[in-house]
């Protein structure tokens, strides 16, 4: 009897061993990049899995036999593979091709985890490395480049700031590898020019209100993703030199640029090191006249130093360190002269401006990141420590009593702990949960260079736990839902306001601690079954302490004394975004579309009160739509187009009134054609942009002038040209022309009269001739 029992136990263990085989694998695209979020099935069974952030999957406890493994996902061509299971685990690595680059593109910003665009129920624009490489041959101004490529984003101002630029009519949060660059406590509009384009691998733009990264993303997020190491070589590099200048009047307009990059992987180490130096010349308009130096891109010295090193501890663990230094300073030999809004532009004449030089003396960014793909079963961990130290100086102005330059300093220290757990309950319910906590200390102030305190030091401490669920329901419905709890403590010292413009100043304000608590939500649903029609609907909220510094510096004297807690309106803004949209892929044709509504009970518009720009906290409603389309006519010929419309109103004393031009931009349309007439030798790109008109306001009867942001905007069109000739795989010569047909125009913000001194023409035709050598 004992022998029978022993034999039975042995047979049972043997059977269990036979029934416990696993299929392990990894799925990559044609560039060997991991593809997350793909669904893996064994036909005829209930076995299923989802690839994790690194493209890995495991099908557990598969009985011996022959099966068909199916890998599928939005934006990729389905792969079917015959597999046979015997007595051992097997490994099956696959490569999948994209059926639509737009849907298959991997994004990390939207959900703080690697996922494809086709699995995100919101509007996303990605500017790829190829686009950046091509269009930076026309202009290295990232501000202008984004305006030409992102529907819903205001066209660039042709200056060193993004004043008046919005994403879907609201402020946006700018980041570098997730490190916030924006200064929402005192918005200086210098966050877009915070890094050189040479070290950006791609740009991810998440549209619509979101709180996933905290304060300031009422219109969305723009995240600059920095370059990664070359994993195929121990040592590689690229040298890029170029010269640029005006085609309307070359005198004093010539500039130069040199950039050097080294990269490679040595055993478990990988590295990227880069340095860039650029000197721009004088900018001229279409008639050859010198453009006014006010916040100009002309005569700027730009320096960028970048380094990133990584170490793979083992197959699951990695540590990575990044640092970037950016500096841009203007060495102007011209000063502003003349000009009258609506009649003649402000121009540049030889002279020396009093006060300090304008520009950004430094912007330091660094992070230390630890990642573990499997901290415990089905769960990955990312821990990120980051730091930013930013200092920028504005132009000299007699706006301040006795004259002076104001500056903004911002010091940020942060910690992010992010976990992701995948789950596979059944073929009809699987997905992942991302959760963690953000800790941020942001210290921002706006002094004058001479030491006077224009805006006092604001010391914000932010603690925010969050959770984000992504689940496939009945295979084809993708549900995303999440929440974030903002716990903010803002300390402001006692201060006395200074005189500027028509504001008398001299108001003593009692400081204090301002606490904020807010719970924000998001939810979205996407139907992923059909490539030709992939619709989504979503709701999301953002949390913002918009430009609190501007409010503080305008404190009014009241009975009993002014205080940050009592007499100054410092309420936070909660913005709600409602959106419905779709993506489509039919053979060589692809398209996207979205309609959105954005509301807030408190506004962020500026109004002119006695010559002083003052925040107006009125309820707002913004709505708009966006469309994109592309067609691959030939392997070497593609065409893409986009169109965006946005409009908004706020509550006024006599009903609804339109939002100013500093918030709402005219309609924008683009048409891009890329053609390679000589295979692997010659590339040509033609990029057209149309900016429409917006004339919503009348002259102020009291001043017989246009209020700030109320100027009538007329339409204009611009065409840019890119050409590149590849002598071989290592050497390329490029020629880019900005404003090819030398259009004579005023940028949108100049026409809107966003500021009294911004009636400045856009640049005339400019060339950029460069040589790139890779080794």
For the regions a protein language model found, what residue spans apply to each?
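A beta-strand signature from Gram-negative outer-membrane beta-barrel systems
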Residues: 197-238, 774
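Membrane-embedded beta-barrel scaffold of Gram-negative outer-membrane proteins
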Residues: 378-398, 526-528, 534-544, 550-553, ...
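Transmembrane beta-barrel wall of Gram-negative outer-membrane proteins
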Residues: 251-280, 289-333, 362, 425, ...
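Short, acidic, small-residue-rich periplasmic hinge/interaction motif at the N-terminus
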Residues: 28, 33, 39-43, 72-76, ...
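Face-selective signature of the C-terminal outer-membrane beta-barrel domain
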Residues: 3, 312-327, 359-503, 510-511, ...
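Extracytoplasmic beta-strand/coil segments of soluble accessory domains associated
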Residues: 143-183, 201
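Short acidic/polar hinge/loop motifs at secondary-structure boundaries
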Residues: 60, 144, 179-207, 260
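Gram-negative outer-membrane beta-barrel transporters
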Residues: 240, 440, 475, 595-600, ...
């Amino acid at each position: 009897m004992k022998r029978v029992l022993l034999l039975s136990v042995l047979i049972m263990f043997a059977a269990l061993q036979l029934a416990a085989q696993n299929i392990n694998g990894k799925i990559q695209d044609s560039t060997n990049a991991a593809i997350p979020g793909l669904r893996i099935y064994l036909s005829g069974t209930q076995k299923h899995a989802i690839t994790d952030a690194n493209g890995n999957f495991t099908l557990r406890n598969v009985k011996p036999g022959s099966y068909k493994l199916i890998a599928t996902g939005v934006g990729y061509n389905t792969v079917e593979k015959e597999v046979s299971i015997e007595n051992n685990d097997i490994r099956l690595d696959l490569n999948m091709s994209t059926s639509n680059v737009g849907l298959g593109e991997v994004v990390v910003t939207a959900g703080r985890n690697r996922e494809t665009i086709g699995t995100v129920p919101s509007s996303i624009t990605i500017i790829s490395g190829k686009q950046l490489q091509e269009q930076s041959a026309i202009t290295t101004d990232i501000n202008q480049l984004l305006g030409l490529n992102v529907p819903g984003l205001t066209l660039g101002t042709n200056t060193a700031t993004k004043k008046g630029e919005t994403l879907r009519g609201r402020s946006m949060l700018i980041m570098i590898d997730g490190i916030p660059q924006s200064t929402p406590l005192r918005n200086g509009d210098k966050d877009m020019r915070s890094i050189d384009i040479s070290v950006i691998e791609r740009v991810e733009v998440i549209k619509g209100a979101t709180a996933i990264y905290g304060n300031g993303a009422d219109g969305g997020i723009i995240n600059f993703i920095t370059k990664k190491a070359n994993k195929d070589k121990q040592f590689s590099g690229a040298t890029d030199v170029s010269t640029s200048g005006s085609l309307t009047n070359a005198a004093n307009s010539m500039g130069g640029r040199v950039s050097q990059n080294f990269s490679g992987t040595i055993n478990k180490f990988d590295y990227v090191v880069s340095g860039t130096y650029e000197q721009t010349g004088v900018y001229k308009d279409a008639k050859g006249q010198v453009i006014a130096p006010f916040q100009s891109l002309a005569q700027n010295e730009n320096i960028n130093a970048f380094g990133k090193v990584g170490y793979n501890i083992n197959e699951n663990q990695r540590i990575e360190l990044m640092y970037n230094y950016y500096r841009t300073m203007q060495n102007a030999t011209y000063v502003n002269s003349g000009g009258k809004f609506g009649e003649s532009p402000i121009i540049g004449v030889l002279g020396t401006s009093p006060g300090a030089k304008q520009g950004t003396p430094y912007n330091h960014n660094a992070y230390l990141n630890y990642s573990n793909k499997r901290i415990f079963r089905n769960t990955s961990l990312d821990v990120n420590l980051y730091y930013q130290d930013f200092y920028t100086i504005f132009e000299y102005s007699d706006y301040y009593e006795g004259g002076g330059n104001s500056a903004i300093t911002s010091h940020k220290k942060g910690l992010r702990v992010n976990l992701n757990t995948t789950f596979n309950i059944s073929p009809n319910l699987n997905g992942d949960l991302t959760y963690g906590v953000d800790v941020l200390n942001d210290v921002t102030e706006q002094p004058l260079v001479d030491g006077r305190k224009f805006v006092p030091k604001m010391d914000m401490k932010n603690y925010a736990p969050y959770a984000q669920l992504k689940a496939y329901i009945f295979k084809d419905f993708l549900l995303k839902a999440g929440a974030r709890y903002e716990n903010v403590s803002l300390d402001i010292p006692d201060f006395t306001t200074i005189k500027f413009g028509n504001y008398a100043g001299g108001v003593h304000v009692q400081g204090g601690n301002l606490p904020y608590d807010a719970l924000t939500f998001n939810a979205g649903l996407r139907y992923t079954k059909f490539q030709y029609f992939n619709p989504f609907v979503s709701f999301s909220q953002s949390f913002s302490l918009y430009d609190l510094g501007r409010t503080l510096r305008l404190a009014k004297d009241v009975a009993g004394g002014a205080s940050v807690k009592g007499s100054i309106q410092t309420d936070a803004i909660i913005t709600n975004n409602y959106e419905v949209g779709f993506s489509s892929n039919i053979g060589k044709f692809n398209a996207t579309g979205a309609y959105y509504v954005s509301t807030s009970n408190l506004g962020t518009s500026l109004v002119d009160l006695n010559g002083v720009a003052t925040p107006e906290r009125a309820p707002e409603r913004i709505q708009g739509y966006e469309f994109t389309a592309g067609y691959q006519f030939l392997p070497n010929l593609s065409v893409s187009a986009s169109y965006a419309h946005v409009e908004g109103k706020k509550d006024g004393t006599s009903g609804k009134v339109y939002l100013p031009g500093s918030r709402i931009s005219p309609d924008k349309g683009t048409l891009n054609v890329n053609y390679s007439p000589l295979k692997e030798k010659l590339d040509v790109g033609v990029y057209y942009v149309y900016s429409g008109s917006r004339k919503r306001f009348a002259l102020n009867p009291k001043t017989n002038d246009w209020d700030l942001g109320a100027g009538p905007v007329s339409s204009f069109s611009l065409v840019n040209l890119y050409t590149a000739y590849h002598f071989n795989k290592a050497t390329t010569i490029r020629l880019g022309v900005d404003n090819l047909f030398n259009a004579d125009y005023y940028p949108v913000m100049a026409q809107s009269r966003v500021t009294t001194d911004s009636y400045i023409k856009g640049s005339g035709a400019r060339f950029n001739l460069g040589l790139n050598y890779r080794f």
